[in-house]
Amino acid sequence: QASSDVTFTFTDGGVTGAGDSTAGYEIDGTALTITSGGTYTVSGSCADGSIKVKKSTTGVTLVLDGLTLTSENTAAITCGKSSEVTILVSNGTENSLSDTEQNNDDNYPENENAENAVIKCKDGSTVTLCGDGELTITANGKNGIKSGATTDEDGEASLTIRDLTLNIDAPVNDAINAEQLLNVESGTLTIDAADDAIHCDLVLNIGADGTDGPTIDITNCCEGLEGAELNVCSGDITINASDDCLNAANSDLTDYDFTMTISGGTIDAYSSAGDGFDSNGDLTITGDTVIVWTANTADNEPLDADGTITVSGGTVLAAGGSSGMDMNLEAAQPCVIYGSTGFGGMPGSTQSSLIAADADFTIEDADGNAVYRGTARCGANFILFSSADVVADSAYTLKAGDSSTEGTAQSGTVSTGMGMGGGFPGGGQKPDGELPEGFDGQMPNGEKPELPDGEVPEMPSGERPTPPSGQGSPTDGNAPAGDSTSDTTPTA
């Protein structure tokens, strides 16, 4: 068993350490291998070095105490199969780990040492990354942190992150990628990733009930948080994504019960070219604050689920280009929807936004009291709002500049499908299902919608009225001018 206080210093010339080379570690040039449990403190700077915890080694605490370490062709830190390791970032210290483009066996198949991550946790390893210091990871090869799978041979695998300040720059692939179980319990994370910011093939937990949770700032990514089972229990999360901000999915799993559950914390998310929250199963929101915007294009949906979307608590503002196709929404807590259905979200739509980008807006009750106040992240044709202040069957007005749009709060099973009816603003049809005056049944792009039987019903007189403008919509067929931003006293 190694001493509980073995200290190593990295330099470009090698690694120096106190104690006998047989006492739980081996040094080979700038490569340090830990072979026995104990506490090991590492510091210094090295342009090409590495730390490895040997397979099946348990009870290891690796203390980063002002370490700057780059590894050219492998991981800077590797936790072997079936190992149990705590990587502790020492209080008040700044530490940096990085690799090079050679640490990627897809691009460098001849590199037998490539681990495809700056920190590699192999199958069956249980790793905790924690401490009160700061760690910056730069992943020039592939991933920032990679955690392995649970296997019969190697045992259960998990990765837990807590307390520390963690900065990850991953210009090639994922910032954090886990195969089995990933718990981000607390700490401050800042992430810039080419692909996923935080990804887990199976279970991803953010925060925990009754805790403040982590602060996560994802400045750039393709997808933000992704797991087959995605649970957000607490935390303060900001996401700027080009695809889905939150995604419950795994293309390698078939016949799986995908779930996305948001029970606490604050999420402020924006997608420039994808869905806001996308679940391949059910999507459930029970608490705290969810603000999600998707760019104002036809196929971007702020909330999207193959199963049921349930809103039963918290403050929820979901705004975007469209409501998508049929949204199976169960509003245990009443929701008010603006621009919900009709033609506004369909491809080829010329519908203008309910609310324009950067517009300040409010949602007010019948007495003029603001139940929500915010600023639009982008233009939106569709806005869903829910909070504890919203009362079923009551009227709420969305106001942005000189524009206002009325809505009525609904509870229970709420239809937001893109049929011929509903959602008069931008929908081209009145809530009662009658064609508005001056409307000839055309889509905004001039194409007639197909009805189930393929026929367009005749008006009672047998003729269609001629639109005043000669076009197929009242005035321009667009939603009321202006932007829509919601504001419920929490601000967006």
Region locations from a protein language model:
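A composition-driven surface/loop motif
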Residues: 1-492
